[in-house]
Amino acid sequence: DAGLFKENANPTKDEVNIYANSMQRCIATARYFTTAFLPVADIQVNHRYVPSKMDPVFFPRLTKISESFKKEALKQIADMGGKRGIRGINEDLKKAYEITASTLDLKDSPACKEGKLCAFDNYNTEILLERGEEPRMKGSLKDATTCSDALILQYYEEPDAKKAAFGHDLSLEDWTQIARIKDVYGDVLFAAPIVAVNVAHPLLTYMYDELNAKGRKFSFLCGHDSNIASVTAALDVEPYELPNSIEKKTPIGSKVVIEKFEGKD
């Protein structure tokens, strides 16, 4: 509608840049997108490393770290739970934890019978911040997120909602609660301002260069939900919740769109 490209356009390499992290799923997603975006053009999907090797531009790892950085990062993360701190973050997820555990029949699971995991009741989340590594955590939020990820994928892939929930009758609100765990996990690890600016810096630098590249009309960067979480936090994007989605922050297939307009005005 804006006249950026004509129908059946075949843009030059300078006009379009399709750049993916070198993970297999990112390369595939970029190819699928490009086929639909410019179906008659032979557009190269650029990635820099052998498949399944993380590209530093998309790798949300801590590039600089110090004791003062750790202290401030942990404070900012704890502030997400209000006066109750880290424990408060988990307490606010109590209902979501219970729905997820019930859906998985966690108390009757092999993990529980082996004494490994019977409930998501370890609220003392441990945050691990190391130079050159992604922010990590230990505790129930981590365990529940692993389960939430799997269930949400199943929700999208399985047409039968009851089958997706292992025979349980889950409401849309129940699924939203399960998905909320993943959203909170992303915020805790990547959305604290001091952490977001740190881990998103390589990608933000690349984005800045793309927005200022001579002759560039369109750039498509294909990464991960952690990239969206850190970039939006680093740019101080106002809080939002997506409508008509059980995932309110970074659903599968979500995109951040940045437009640059130039003219006499």
Predicted regions and their residues:
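Signature for phosphate-centric chemistry
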Residues: 2-17, 21-219, 223-265
